[in-house]
Design a protein with these regions (language model features):
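Amphipathic alpha-helical "coupling" segments that flank catalytic cores
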Residues: 1-622
């Protein structure tokens, strides 16, 4: 199982579990149920008083908050995202004496700066929200504020003749910025609608924290919704102030857009010489040259239009030196598409320029077009190979170049878009482009890069609910073609519930142990004349017959069918172990039987190393 290896020694998983419990593996108990045998630890933990627990709990919670930048205030040494002026810690009606961030706990809170009482005494912990709302004009509950904002902005969108687009991240941000939300509808100059929609939305959403509104066709309307922290007595002035700020920002966006349109993307390629990709790997212009070569190579393998892919690769980074992307970095690729369309580039080229950044994160959409997929693969493989060459592989939780995300993107594209390419070949092709530029990639760097990409399978498929032993079993059989890996893994996950799967897994585990412990090497070919026992003759014949039977299924990647055929070997395998002694004194006979077992193991390894499947069952025999 996962807790002990074949020699009965505890695995790192078992020792780690014991260490986390503060005991040794020997002190753990064994629990057996219908799902197998488990290691467990039981301990009696005495209760503790709330007042002794609350302060360390508060400190722990504060430390775990994802705050990238902390600040200090006053003369104290406490650090937090913003200055902290009071702390309320109550258990029922009683103040729990403790301290956090240099502040002693009490029962005095504060209301809304403009709409509530300056000092509010909280009599009872259960009255906290009600008291703050009544006396302080503060809606303390985050979810309540969020729902209120959503209702308000939705109503205003309808009032404007459209529908408010509620971005969840923006909703969370605005909810955290206000205590008493009050939404206001504003307008901007319709002339700005000539600027790319994404830039207008970015100005509203990312820069101003405004919600935008679309019509029934999904077109942007020249209105916005801001959420104020007060109900102003002069809402017109508040609205006018927000309109003035937004119109100024949109005017900047229009200026950059009109300026960028004066130069075609093709004229910007040389500017990439001035943009560093990596100190050891050259500029973005150098990367562009490599992408052109690699994209063509991938296009040839997939038998798709090389010219379109090469053109998209030539232009794909040029929008990075435009004013629009300088102002809106999050729109890289999108601005490239707009500018390519303006330059009358082929539609497929414009689309690929935008799509080659997909997926941007784990759950993002994938490139929909073939040139987009080709370029997305080339871009990520080039970065992976180059940065491993430069010694920038991720360590621990540090991944400054996003290589885990890049590797996962490669795997997702190949699997979900059913692109049957080999990772090893992609890495080798990319390494060739570096070598052609005078920067050869060593064998070790390539090996590390390939292993790194394949290791992404674990996180991806574990998140999809596949067991680690299933993933390990397929990885052991080879996983350089992600689409093929996906098909084999799904077939194996179903096969493990087959009535003969457990017995075959146990038999394969025994075969693996025998082969590993054997001191002599296995012969390249089986010698039929040395097959003397009827059980080993039957096994040899069954292996030959099964190999021929599964070959067509494997050729068409029908792994469920191949595994069903392999399952038919169980009776002859069980008989072999019941009737045949492998490790006999006769060396030629022993070598021949080891060779026979090697052939059997290799037959299963065309799909997976099923000996790695965890099962309590063991084969009988000698």
């Amino acid at each position: 199982g996962a807790a002990f290896d074949d020699q009965g020694q505890p695995t790192p998983a078992a020792t780690g579990f014991a260490r986390s419990c503060g005991v040794t593996v020997d002190q753990l108990e064994r629990l057996e149920n219908d799902k197998g045998q488990w290691l467990v630890h039981r301990a009696l933990v005495p209760g503790a008083l709330a007042r002794s627990l609350i302060e360390p709990c508060i400190h722990s919670a504060i430390e775990k908050l994802p705050i990238p930048k902390r600040m200090r205030w006053g003369e104290g040494l406490a650090e937090f995202v913003r200055p902290v002026h009071w702390l309320v810690v109550l258990h029922g009606q009683r103040v729990l004496p403790c301290e956090a961030l240099g502040i002693a706990a009490g029962r005095i809170s504060r209301g809304h700066r403009f709409m509530g009482e300056a000092r509010i005494s909280i009599r009872n912990a259960g009255d906290y929200e009600k008291t703050l709302k009544k006396q302080g004009a503060v809606i303390a509950d985050f979810n309540t504020r969020s729902r209120l904002i959503e209702q308000q902005v939705s109503r205003l969108g309808i009032k404007a003749g459209g529908k408010t687009v509620i971005d969840p991240q923006l909703l969370d941000t605005v909810t955290a910025l206000v205590e008493k939300p009050h939404a206001l509808l504003g307008q901007f100059d319709p002339a700005f609608l000539k600027v790319p929609t994404e830039a207008l939305i970015s100005s509203m959403r990312d820069h101003q924290k405004y919600f935008h509104v679309i019509d029934t066709r999904g077109k942007l309307l020249p209105v916005f919704i801001t959420v104020s922290n007060i109900r102003s007595t002069a809402p017109g002035r508040v609205r006018a102030g927000n309109e003035r700020v937004l119109n100024a920002r949109l005017a900047d966006a229009r200026f950059f857009w009109e300026t960028d349109n004066r130069r075609p993307l093709d004229n910007r390629v040389d500017e990439l010489d001035g943009v560093l990709f990596h100190q050891a790997l050259g500029s973005l212009h150098d990367k562009t040259r490599r992408l052109e070569t690699l994209s063509v190579k991938i296009a040839q393998t997939l038998r798709v239009d090389e010219t379109l892919c090469a053109r998209a690769a030539h232009l794909c980074k040029t929008d990075l030196v435009t004013g629009m992307v300088g102002e809106f970095p999050e729109l890289q690729g999108t601005m490239g598409r707009y500018l390519a369309q303006h330059d009358k580039e082929p539609a497929a080229v414009a689309r690929a320029i935008e799509e080659h950044y997909l997926p941007r994160h784990a759950r993002d959409k994938l490139p929909a077009s073939t040139p987009g997929r080709v370029l997305a693969l080339a871009d990520r493989i080039d970065s992976l190979v180059g940065l491993f060459l430069a010694g920038e592989e991720p360590t621990g939780d540090k991944d400054p170049y996003g290589l885990r995300r890049a590797a996962l993107g490669v795997i997702r594209i190949l699997i979900e878009k059913k692109v049957d390419l080999d990772i090893v070949e992609l890495v080798n092709h990319s390494a060739d482009t570096y070598a052609a530029a005078g920067n050869p990639v060593g064998a070790n760097a390539k090996k590390q890069c390939i292993a790194f990409v394949m290791e992404r399978y674990r996180a991806l498929y574990a998140a999809l609910g596949f067991a680690q032993d299933e993933i390990s079993a397929v990885l052991e059989a080879g996983a350089s073609r992600p689409l093929d890996f996906d098909r084999r893994l799904k077939a194996l996950a179903k096969f493990r519930h087959h009535r003969d799967a457990a017995s075959l897994a146990a038999a394969n585990k025994r075969i693996r142990n025998i082969l590993r412990k054997s001191e002599q090497s296995i012969a390249k070919e089986l010698k039929p004349q040395l097959l003397i026992e009827s059980a080993e003759i039957a096994l040899s014949e069954a292996i030959l017959e099964t190999a021929g039977a599964i070959a067509p299924a494997i050729a068409r990647a029908d792994y469920p069918a191949a595994l069903r055929i392999l399952a038919g070997l169980r009776p002859v395998v069980d008989r072999f172990f019941d009737e045949v002694m492998v490790m006999v004194e006769d060396l030629p006979l022993r070598t021949n039987r080891l060779t026979l077992l090697g052939q059997l193991s290799s037959l299963f390894l065309t799909i997976a190393d099923i000996s790695l499947l965890q099962t309590p069952e063991r084969p009988s025999g000698r």
